Amino acid sequence: MIQQETRLKVADNSGAREILTIKVLGGSGRKFANIGDVIVASVKQATPGGAVKKGDVVKAVIVRTKTGARRPDGSYIKFDDNAAVIIRDDKTPRGTRIFGPVARELREGGYMKIVSLAPEVL
């Protein structure tokens, strides 16, 4: 579960390395986000020469969480880190590569470009 002030790894090559959650989108009193949810975040660490800079406010979709997600068949999927991919308003990623595995739940959320770029979908 990702909430306000949570720091996340960035799993793409947009130039950001770490982001801090500002707000969870999707409802007025929503406190937590899970895999496939969109957040507004601030870039805390960035690589030089990247598309996004430190201090930029960006939208991101969560692709991995330590808490994990429950599947309809009763199984759970958990990851070793909390990670997100920076996206544009039309749900396409800002970067051109995705690093690490992503969850299958992104396919139902309409993030097919992220799923197709990912090296592994679990």
UniProtKB/Swiss-Prot annotation:
GO terms for molecular function: large ribosomal subunit rRNA binding; structural constituent of ribosome. The keyword Ribonucleoprotein applies. The keyword Protease does not apply. It comes from the Bacteria. One of its GO terms (cellular component) is cytosolic large ribosomal subunit. Gene3D superfamilies: Ribosomal protein L14. GO terms for biological process: translation. Keywords: Ribonucleoprotein, Ribosomal protein, RNA-binding, rRNA-binding. Belongs to the universal ribosomal protein uL14 family. HAMAP family: Ribosomal_uL14. PANTHER family: 50S/60S RIBOSOMAL PROTEIN L14/L23, LARGE RIBOSOMAL SUBUNIT PROTEIN UL14M. Binds to 23S rRNA. Forms part of two intersubunit bridges in the 70S ribosome. Part of the 50S ribosomal subunit. Forms a cluster with proteins L3 and L19. In the 70S ribosome, L14 and L19 interact and together make contacts with the 16S rRNA in bridges B5 and B8. This is Large ribosomal subunit protein uL14. It comes from Streptococcus agalactiae serotype V (strain ATCC BAA-611 / 2603 V/R). The lineage of its organism: Bacteria, Bacillati, Bacillota, Bacilli, Lactobacillales.
